[in-house]
Amino acid sequence: MNQDNFKVSVAICTFNGAAFVEAQLESILAQSRSPDEIILCDDGSTDGTIDVVKKISDKYPDKIKIFQNERRLGSCRNFERAISLVTGDLIFLSDFDDVWFPEKVATMIRVFAEDPGFVMAYSDAVITDVELRPTGTVFNRRKDTDLRKTPSLQQLSRGVAFNGPMMAFHSRLKPFVIPFSPLSLQWTHDHWIGYIAYAVGKIGVIERPLVYYRRHGKNEGGDAEFDGGLLYQWRVVKKKYQGSEEYGERRRGWEDMVTRLHEIRNGGLPLSNPAKLDKLLQVSELCLQFAKARQMHKTRGRLARAPSALRLLFAGDYHRYARGVKSFVQDLLIP
């Protein structure tokens, strides 16, 4: 398919991003291959984000459409809304605080033009500080996100293999991924999309960075994955997991994924690799069983839960479906 025949949409979500959103929108508008539409959904910003955006959108009224949520949806649901509103063949996701390389859109379009079997294109990114000073690349700094090597199914299930600003996906993926699981503790929007994309089609990997991924302490994503400090990672873990209810959300998140994969398999929509879907479904069902076991032993006191946690550790489940010893220690120590 000719590259010019694709309609390109950008789904961008904002929340109190006045300090960064102008630079991001300018980088999108300055693409060597300009997107055809930009759908921006704001989740109740109170810092003047909308004023900044409107100054830019007034110059491009036919390209930029702004939607303001009547109530806060949260990042995952906000992206679900934005994706449901786009009308393009290819969908690019954008956080409000990153900056795209000028050739990002053109480079990622080529993946789909050269092979119609691809449902997603995925690139590397340059990690930066708040002032866009580079500190490394995602593929080199974050072990489980380097898609240059085919990830194991267990690696995908651990939840860190996909980052929204690094992906573009074909619109034929929309009926598979929407609606999202409502339990964002288990599934961020990008992990949900990437996991299902891997199940139903092919992902084309671009080995060079096409976006600056800005870290500033308020990112929606999992910054702990980039930080080597054990104390920092422990604080993040302790903040995220505080009791059996959170583990219940993770269990229900895996129930949502297993249900969705069964619906896809039985729904009659064309798949490029049904065998791969079946394998990922099997792994997802094992992840669900593991999540149920973790939830069960978290309802007990620390000493009482130790035997069941040790059984999971020695069986290898913590390494297959979680983060190994880190998750084991987390389950023992956090109430």
Residue ranges and their predicted role:
Residues 42-51, 71:
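A conserved acidic beta->alpha catalytic loop
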Residues 17-30:
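Short, well-formed alpha-helical segments that are part of the catalytic scaffolds
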Residues 91:
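Short aromatic/hydrophobic "clamp" motif used to bind/position activated sugar donors
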Residues 84, 149-229:
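Conserved nucleotide-sugar donor-binding catalytic segment
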Residues 104-136:
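Conserved donor NDP-sugar-binding/catalytic core segment of glycosyltransferases
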Residues 69-86, 151:
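Glycine-rich, basic loop-to-helix element that forms the pyrophosphate-binding segment
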Residues 6-9, 37, 192:
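Cell-envelope/extracellular polymer assembly enzymes that use nucleotide-activated donors
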Residues 266-335:
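Membrane-interface aromatic/basic loop that binds lipid-linked glycans or pyrophosphate carriers
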